[in-house]
Amino acid sequence: MTARPSAEARPPAPPATRDALARYTGTLAGRVAVVTGAGTGIGRATSLALAAAGADVALLGRRQEPLDEVATLIGGLGRRAFACPVDVTDAPAVEAAARSAATALGPADVAVASAGVNAWADIDALDPATLRAALATNVEGIANVIRAVLPAMRVASRGKLVVIASDNGRRPEPGGAGYVASKFGAVGLALSISQELHAAGIGVHVVEPGCVSTPWYPPAEEAPRGRMLHPDDVALAVLFLATLPEHVVLEELLLVPRDLLVHPWG
């Protein structure tokens, strides 16, 4: 399999994306965000974008080292960061992490559920353990994070919950039964929770990105990276949702590269 680039090895975001991100500077001043999957890929980009917009950020993820790296970068932006290694499938551990983050930074105003795992395989080759892991992380993990931050948001009668799903949460593909099932589940979970929380003043938003250049995307020859979204493009969508007026709810945001629509690739 072709080697996949690290977060540091990927090219910077397009200038238009960088310019758009810069326009959000200061828009989240005084706010606290919690991000899962914060050490790599979309979670990393989102954490940095939230900090650049003025938020203090609690960084949750499996591995301490990448979380510490992101925390250092956030400190360089003049914001506070709290790095806490946690497995989102462990509900008690997630609740403990949320409490620790609230003690360190304050209660969450924004929570971004970005942690996810892959599970691409034809059904006859899909290992049951792999399927269970995908459902546990990509669906149950989201529920665990939302439950952990929700009490404080209920007290405040406001908050933003952003779920990073996938365009595969609306679009099935052959060879992706396990992953697609988990993302359909993530979308359904989030939209159901959105209906529950309208009256509480809490917005639930689902971002459905497709073809994002992250380390675990299929090899470059299967999807040319120059034609893919950059993680910062997804982070930009999160900032847009996080700064919407409280009375506005945009439940679903499909995000794909224009080139994919014009010249699809398989």
Residue spans of the language-model regions?
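Residue(s) in the substrate-gating loop at a strand-loop-helix junction
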Residues: 166
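Active-site helix of classical SDR
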Residues: 146, 182
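Conserved glycine-rich Rossmann-like NAD(P)H-binding loop of the short-chain dehydrogenase/reductase
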Residues: 55-69
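Conserved glycine-rich cofactor-binding loop
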Residues: 32, 39-41
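The beta1-alpha1 cofactor-binding region of Rossmann-like NAD(H)/NADP(H)-dependent oxidoreductases
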Residues: 85-96, 128
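Substrate-binding pocket helix/loop in short-chain dehydrogenase/reductase
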Residues: 122-123, 127-135
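C-terminal helical subdomain
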Residues: 199-202, 206-207, 222-263
